Amino acid sequence: MAHLDTREKLAILADAAKYDASCASSGTTKRSSVGGKGIGSTEGMGICHSYAPDGRCISLLKILLTNACIFDCHYCINRRSSNVRRARFTVDEVVRLTLAFYKRNYIEGLFLSSGIIGSPDYTMEAMVRVARTLRLDHDFRGYIHLKTIPDAAPELLEEAGLYADRLSINIELPT
């Protein structure tokens, strides 16, 4: 992977996260907002809307930890053989981005998924570190939704549940 700055990574990994239907953005095209750069544009990098357990609509930073993957699932845009630009955040980059967006009131939480790098456990452990660092090191009280990584160790899923408000299972269905 070429060296990318945080903004370039955000553009790639927010765009790659849009294929996850469990956190959909508004999808509006009102007032030519799609593709616009003005106030009210609905194409904010990585911002989506979801519903909290209490029913409130909340804005989330929706990103992938990486869009690189060791698997080659034919239905997945991020499959190993896919000709897409690859990027990968570090744990610290995700933490810094989340806090920066949160402190500016752009978001109320984080939605984090990932391609699988190294192994399912390696990837899930990195995602858990993001949530744990936000909660314990930064006293983050915002919402955290983690997509679990298939075949990750049950202990990692249990630990993820200690820090995330919501866990969801990554079940892919071809269309």
Where are the regions a protein language model picked out?
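Flexible, acidic/Gly-rich N-terminal and inter-domain linker regions that tether
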Residues: 1-68
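Short, flexible, glycine/charge-rich loop motifs used to bind or transfer phosphoryl groups or to couple energy/partner
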Residues: 48-51, 100, 157
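General secondary-structure edge motif
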Residues: 40, 49, 53-56, 74, ...
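Short N-terminal amphipathic alpha-helices
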Residues: 59, 72-75, 87
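Core AdoMet radical
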Residues: 79-94, 102-128, 133-175
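Local cysteine-cluster metal-coordination motifs and their immediate loop/turn environment
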Residues: 67-79
